[in-house]
C-alpha cells in the first residue's frame, strides 16, 4: 500500500510542478532539472511515471481542451447588430472558441508554446483531432449532411493545421490580431461549407468584439482552474 501511495503522491507533485513551470517558464524553457527540483523527485521516479515531460503536457492539454467550448459560451454577449442568435448559434460558438485560442497565444508566449507543441506532437494532436471531431460534427453537419464523424475527423486534421500555423506566427504591425482572426475564420468556415452570408455575420461579430479583453478574462480563469486542478500557486 505504501508503494502505491508514494507513486500517486509523486505523480501529483510532478504534474503540479510541470504545469506551473510550463506556465511560468514555457514548455521549452522548462528543463528536467527544474522539474525534479520543484517536484522533489528523482529522475528515476519521474521516468517511471511519465518517461518525458511530454506525458505531463498531454494531461495539461486534455484538461485545457475539455472545457474550451464552455468557456467560449460564457463569453458570448447578446447583440442585435449582427442578425444572429448569439446564445444558440453553434457556428458562432466555434468562431469565438477558436478566436479565443488564437488570442491567448498573442497574450502569453508560454501559452503559445503549449498550444503549438500540442498541435505538433503526434500523440497529443491525435487526441485533439478525436475530441474535436465530435464537436465539429454537431456544429457543421447541417452544412455537410453527407459526412460522418469520421469525415469531420479528417477535416479537423486540416483545420487544426491551419490553427497551428496561425498560432506559431506572432502578430505584428503588418499582421494584426483582427486580420489573423479574419483569415483563420474565412479558411475554416469555408472548409465546413458555411454559407457566405452566415460567414459575414460571424466575421462582423468577431471583428466588433474585444477579443483581447475576452481572452484575457478566459486566461485568468484558466490559470485559476489549472492551479486548483493541479494544486499549485503561480509566482507573481
Feature-to-residue mapping (PLM):
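The short coil/loop that forms the "turn" connecting the two helices of the helix-turn-helix
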Residues: 9-10, 41
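An amphipathic alpha-helix adjacent to DNA-recognition modules
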Residues: 11-16, 28-29, 49-73, 77
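C-terminal peripheral helix-coil segments that are non-catalytic and often amphipathic
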Residues: 138, 142, 168, 172-236
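Short, hydrophobic secondary-structure boundary micro-motifs
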Residues: 112-117, 198-201
Amino acid at each position: 500500500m505504501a508503494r502505491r501511495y508514494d507513486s500517486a503522491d509523486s505523480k501529483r507533485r510532478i504534474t503540479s510542478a510541470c504545469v506551473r513551470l510550463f506556465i511560468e517558464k514555457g514548455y521549452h524553457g522548462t528543463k528536467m532539472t527544474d522539474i525534479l527540483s520543484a517536484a522533489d523527485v528523482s529522475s528515476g521516479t519521474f521516468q517511471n511515471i511519465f518517461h518525458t515531460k511530454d506525458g505531463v503536457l498531454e494531461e495539461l492539454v486534455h484538461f485545457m481542451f475539455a472545457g474550451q467550448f464552455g468557456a467560449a459560451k460564457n463569453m458570448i454577449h447578446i447583440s442585435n447588430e449582427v442578425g444572429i442568435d448569439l446564445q444558440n448559434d453553434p457556428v458562432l460558438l466555434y468562431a469565438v472558441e477558436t478566436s479565443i485560442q488564437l488570442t491567448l497565444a498573442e497574450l502569453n508566449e508560454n501559452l503559445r508554446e503549449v498550444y503549438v507543441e500540442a498541435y505538433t506532437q503526434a500523440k497529443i494532436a491525435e487526441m485533439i483531432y478525436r475530441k474535436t471531431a465530435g464537436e465539429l460534427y454537431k456544429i457543421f453537419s447541417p452544412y455537410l449532411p453527407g459526412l460522418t464523424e469520421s469525415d469531420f475527423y479528417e477535416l479537423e486534421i486540416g483545420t487544426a493545421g491551419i490553427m497551428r500555423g496561425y498560432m506559431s506566427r506572432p502578430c505584428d504591425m503588418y499582421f494584426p490580431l483582427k486580420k489573423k482572426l479574419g483569415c483563420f475564420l474565412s479558411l475554416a468556415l469555408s472548409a465546413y461549407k458555411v454559407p457566405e452570408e452566415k460567414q459575414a455575420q460571424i466575421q462582423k461579430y468577431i471583428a466588433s468584439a474585444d477579443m483581447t479583453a475576452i481572452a484575457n478574462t478566459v486566461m485568468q480563469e484558466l490559470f485559476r482552474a489549472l492551479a486548483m486542478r493541479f494544486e499549485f500557486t503561480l509566482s507573481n
